[in-house]
Amino acid sequence: MIRMDIVGITWAALMVVFTFSLSLVVWGRSGL
């Protein structure tokens, strides 16, 4: 159970980082 929780947290963190970096690239190309 603990391992599954770690995997879930890792996936959630990955999605947050991916979304953040993606929005950062979009903002950079927009000139903001």
Curated annotation (Swiss-Prot):
This is Cytochrome b6-f complex subunit 8. Component of the cytochrome b6-f complex, which mediates electron transfer between photosystem II (PSII) and photosystem I (PSI), cyclic electron flow around PSI, and state transitions. The keyword Membrane applies. It comes from Pinus koraiensis. One of its GO terms (biological process) is photosynthesis. Belongs to the PetN family. Pfam families: PetN. GO terms for cellular component: chloroplast thylakoid membrane; cytochrome b6f complex. Disulfide bonds: none annotated. One of its GO terms (molecular function) is electron transporter, transferring electrons within cytochrome b6/f complex of photosystem II activity. The chain crosses the membrane at residues 6-26. It comes from the Eukaryota. Keywords: Chloroplast, Electron transport, Membrane, Photosynthesis, Plastid, Thylakoid, Transmembrane, Transmembrane helix, Transport. It is a single-pass membrane protein.
